[in-house]
Structures are given as structure tokens and as C-alpha cells.
Amino acid sequence: MDIAIRGGYAPNERVQAVRLMDNEFIPVAAPDYLASNGTPMHATDLRDHQGLFFRTPNGPHPWMCEENGQWLDVSGKALSISNNSTWLRREAVAWRGICMTPRWSVQEDLDSGKVKELLITPKVRITQNKNLAIYLLYQKQQYSVPKVKVAVDFLVSHIQSQ
């Protein structure tokens, strides 16, 4: 494999990692869901709501917040758990519950009003690590290969200019 695009944390030094963009997860829900169930204002209010959770190999991403120097699990009741983020986003649009999803993946639905970003305090996260991003990865020695250099340079300039 010449190049890869990965969401998460910066990998180790064995590969070259170029940060393309932030991968901030935000809580969203359909306006009709919020009208029927109320809009959570504080992170702990999420515990009373239906949750749409993304599953990783280690299990569902919890919803967490930092309050008074401690991390709290504020996860809602698990209505659906899936490793298909597109399906989870569709469930949120269909008024099923609250979903923590990357901003870039739901931006079109936010712009159209299909979902609303929940402005909750303190800020809700899926991890204690605040440096989630989308990275372009390649082997350091591969950059000298013309096709890899052209692809890397194009992707970096195209994505970072948006």
C-alpha cells in the first residue's frame, strides 16, 4: 500500500503522517427528536436520551465530558450500536436519537436543518484525547516515488484548502 487515509490519533514514527483536518465529534439530533424528547443542555442530561453509538473493535464509543478535573461517562441509553457511521447518521436524521459523529460527515445535514448540533456544556467527547484528526499516511521512503509524491501533494493541497 502506497498511501492511506486514517481517522484517529497520530500514528507512531514508522510512517509519515500529514494532518489533513480535524476530526471533531459533535452531538447531533433531528429537530423533531428534540421537540419530542427535550434538548439536553448539560452533558449529564444525555443519560436520559436515546443514543446512537459507533462501535469500534473495543466496543461502543462512550460519551464523556470533563467536569471538575474528572472524566464522566454521560452516555445515553443505547438504542442502536453500529460500525456504520452513515447508517447511524441516517438514524439521527430519522428522529431515532442523539448521535456523536464527526462534524465533516454530518455538515450537509446540519446545513439543511435535518439535524441540529447540540450545544452542551461541558463539551462532550468520545475520548479523553483532544487531538483526533484525519491523517494521510505513507512510508517515509515512498515519498521519493513520483506517483506517491504527486498523490500526497494533491491530497494535502486539495483537502487543506477547503
Feature-to-residue mapping (PLM):
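Hydrophobic hinge/microswitch elements
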Residues: D73-L119, K123, L136
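Short amphipathic alpha-helical segments and helix-helix/interface helices
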Residues: A17, A43, V106-Q107, V152
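A late-sequence structural motif
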Residues: T121-Q162
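Generic structural signal for helix capping and beta-alpha/helix-loop junctions
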Residues: H61, E108, R125-T127
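Residues in well-ordered alpha-helical elements
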Residues: T44, S85-T86, K149
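Acidic, Gly/Pro-rich loop/turn segments at junctions of secondary structure
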Residues: M1-S82
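Short secondary-structure transition/capping segments
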Residues: M1, D111-K114, K130-N131
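A secondary-structure boundary/capping signal
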Residues: A29-A30, P102, Q139
